[in-house]
């Protein structure tokens, strides 16, 4: 007989849910790591909708992720500006940055690094 260690989870039943203006962040704890799915509505901006509640001007969290839908801009404090689109896999270093949704479609992405500390009050 075989022992199984397979774990299945779904974001529609997250282990933790963080909410903020114009967005939600669903977290799953699985296999010793935290994976997050974030949904930002059109008009969302990190500095206004997350950072303001935390008393921060810029996001300080390092991210590794993949965009499921929508488009966002990441603006680094050093002046680098990048648009991130559906299907992109990205790395944002632990350097101050702001971000905002581009267009009228909600932005949805998966976070493989940085999820545990993102938007934590």
Region spans (language model):
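Short acidic-glycine-tyrosine-enriched beta hairpin
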Residues: 76-95
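Glycine- and acidic-residue-biased ligand/ion/polar-headgroup-sensing regions
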Residues: 33, 52-78
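Conserved short histidine dyad/triad with adjacent acidic residue
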Residues: 37-59, 93-94
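A short hydrophobic beta-strand segment most commonly corresponding to one strand
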Residues: 37-38, 91-92, 97-98, 103-121
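A short, N-terminal "cap"/entry segment at the start of jelly-roll beta-barrel domains
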Residues: 1-39, 47
């Amino acid at each position: 007989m075989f022992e199984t260690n397979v774990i299945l989870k779904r974001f529609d039943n997250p282990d933790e849910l963080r909410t903020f203006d114009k967005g939600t962040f669903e977290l799953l704890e699985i296999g010793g790591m935290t994976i997050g799915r974030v949904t930002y509505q059109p008009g969302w901006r990190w500095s206004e909708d997350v950072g303001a509640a935390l008393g921060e001007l810029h996001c300080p969290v390092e991210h590794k992720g993949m965009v499921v839908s929508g488009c966002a801009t990441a603006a680094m404090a050093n002046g680098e500006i990048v648009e991130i689109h559906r299907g992109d896999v990205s790395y944002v270093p632990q350097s101050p940055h702001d971000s905002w949704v581009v267009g009228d479609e909600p932005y949805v992405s998966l976070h493989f690094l940085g999820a545990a500390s993102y938007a934590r009050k």
